[in-house]
C-alpha cells in the first residue's frame, strides 16, 4: 500500500474491529450508508488492492439499505454467523480454527494492552486483532516507541491472523445469506494481506 497513511490504516482497522465486535445499532447502520462513508470508501478504493473488496462492501450496504427491518435482519445475520455452532457459521475465534488462543494474549501484553472489561468475549475474538493492529499503526505515527519494535509486533499479529482469517472469510462467504459480513471479512482479509506484504 502506498497512498494510505498509517493513521488511515489504523482507522480502517478500528472501524472493522468495531463492526465485528457487536451487532450494529441504528446509528451505525445509518453511518455506513452515509455520504461521509462514501467519501471514505472512495479513499480506500484509491488503493488498487482494496478496490474490489470495497466495491463488494458498498454493494452489500446498498442491498442492506433496501431490506425491511435492516437492523433486525443484520442482527439475525450477526447472531447466525458468529454466535451459533460452527456447523453453519463463521465463529470469530482463533481457537475455532485450531489456532493458539494464547498467542493474541501474548501479543497484547507485548503491546502493553489488555482487553476491555466491557468486551465480554474471549481474547482470541476476531475484533481484538484489528484493534491491536489499529493501535500499532497509530503508534507508528506517534514516534514514541521505536518503529522497529512496533513493526515486529505488527508482523507477529498479522502472521497470527493470517493463520485463520482466510478460513473465517470463506465461511462468511458460504453462510452469510445477505453478504454484509462476507464483504466485511473480505475487506479485512485484503487489508491484512496488503499490510503483511508491506514488510
Curated annotation (Swiss-Prot):
UniProtKB keywords: Chaperone, Cytoplasm
GO biological-process terms attached to the record: protein complex oligomerization; protein folding
SUPFAM superfamilies noted in UniProt: TorD-like
Localization (cell): Cytoplasm
A Gene Ontology cellular-component term: cytoplasm
Any Pfam family: Nitrate_red_del
Domain of life assignment: Bacteria
Keyword Chaperone belongs to the record: yes
Keyword presence, Cytoplasm: yes
InterPro entries found in the cross-reference section: Chaperone_TorD, DMSO/NO3_reduct_chaperone, HscB_C_sf, TorD-like_sf, TorD/DmsD_chaperones
Database matches in NCBIfam families: PRK04976.1
Family (UniProt): Belongs to the TorD/DmsD family. TorD subfamily.
Role, per record: Involved in the biogenesis of TorA. Acts on TorA before the insertion of the molybdenum cofactor and, as a result, probably favors a conformation of the apoenzyme that is competent for acquiring the cofactor.
Protein name in the entry: Chaperone protein TorD
Organism: Escherichia coli O6:H1 (strain CFT073 / ATCC 700928 / UPEC)
Name of encoding gene: torD
